[in-house]
Amino acid sequence: MSFDLIIKNGTVILENEARVVDIAVKGGKIAAIGQDLGDAKEVMDASGLVVSPGMVDAHTHISEPGRSHWEGYETGTRAAAKGGITTMIEMPLNQLPATVDRASIELKFDAAKGKLTIDAAQLGGLVSYNIDRLHELDEVGVVGFKCFVATCGDRGIDNDFRDVNDWQFFKGAQKLGELGQPVLVHCENALICDALGEEAKREGRVTAHDYVASRPVFTEVEAIRRVLYLAKVAGCRLHVCHISSPEGVEEVTRARQEGQDVTCESCPHYFVLDTDQFEEIGTLAKCSPPIRDLENQKGMWEKLFNGEIDCLVSDHSPCPPEMKAGNIMEAWGGIAGLQNCMDVMFDEAVQKRGMSLPMFGKLMATNAADIFGLQQKGRIAPGKDADFVFIQPNSSYVLTNDDLEYRHKVSPYVGRTIGARITKTILRGDVIYDIEQGFPVAPKGQFILKHQQ
């Protein structure tokens, strides 16, 4: 058989091993894995490179339509491709209107036409005002539903995202359980975090350490414990977003051991930044839950290596620079991190701490694809989409603002020396990013809908 593409001599991350092997691609799919596979129209030599499944980033905010001056499909997905992401799962908030019904998700699809460099799946929102319309989003094909039990949204904008109270969460989870959809939750105690934050501002405590103190670990743990129980009673699968503390992970592990259907994610910034660095970097490193101290970070690494965290995600949530101005308590909370998930974590987890390549592949791609039912994604295996990222190990560079593809070229990682490089990203058999050529093809990404899987 003649193939469209053969990738030769790379160290390939397979599901349970990594070895030097060739990959054949035909019609955008992985056709064969082995040696001496035959002829191809194109042959790529990946000698000295790690060939990983393209990252499946299960937590991104693109903000289009309505807030494309924050981030947009064109810039956001180019940054993703440059960072080795081939599939993103987009959150239902930051854009206007929030993605909470059929009409709003159709606006998303229209806004993305001709702009997607990578593939995308979409989450719907569970908010205080759409519990009777959740089925609309399920019918369109979302792969899950996001909600906040922490305070969110601009009360001055009618169609912005809104948090839910316990009753609304429970009723929504019941409906989502009936639909067979997971609920994804931002877990922080709204009343306590809001009160502590207001108290700090009144008293003039506005440093990074003050911000972290206003959102203590127990507020995350309490919220995780609460939604675990409510989701269990409601009969709904639960995914806990961006866990920042080992104590929070322990709640998920305990529930899982008791038989509950629950998964969780965390983000690179909780593993590579700490509160002292947050103080130095400033508002660009503000997020919630917040970046915590070194002892907390050490515990998170232990949980990651123990297999208690299912996947790593960017939680890419940028905004215009003026919203990051002023003191840390007042600035927008969100990190621009889409472009540097894979290289930073390959350096920190694999090269510096000895994580196995198969575990890295699961954390960056396989597990997220499985959690959200993306059956063609997340694995290098025959029949799957030919989505790959080439990683050059032990190749250090210093990240600059000019390296970034975001609408606003800022990131808390600027100035960081990163010890690995993404050299090529391939989506369904086509090179969508190359370190020398840039972006050689027109945007070819498409939306992945649940009912098409």
From Swiss-Prot:
Any GO BP annotation: purine nucleobase catabolic process
Entry's Gene Ontology cellular component terms: cytoplasm
Top EC class for this record: hydrolase
Record field: catalytic activity: (S)-allantoin + H2O = allantoate + H(+)
Binding site for Zn(2+) 2: K146, H186, H242
Cofactor: Zn(2+)
Taxonomy, superkingdom: Bacteria
One family name in Pfam for this protein: Amidohydro_1
Family matches, as HAMAP family: Hydantoinase (MF_01645)
Subunit field text: Homotetramer.
UniProt similarity note: Belongs to the metallo-dependent hydrolases superfamily. Allantoinase family.
NCBIfam families in the cross-refs: allantoinase, PRK08044.1
Protein name: Allantoinase
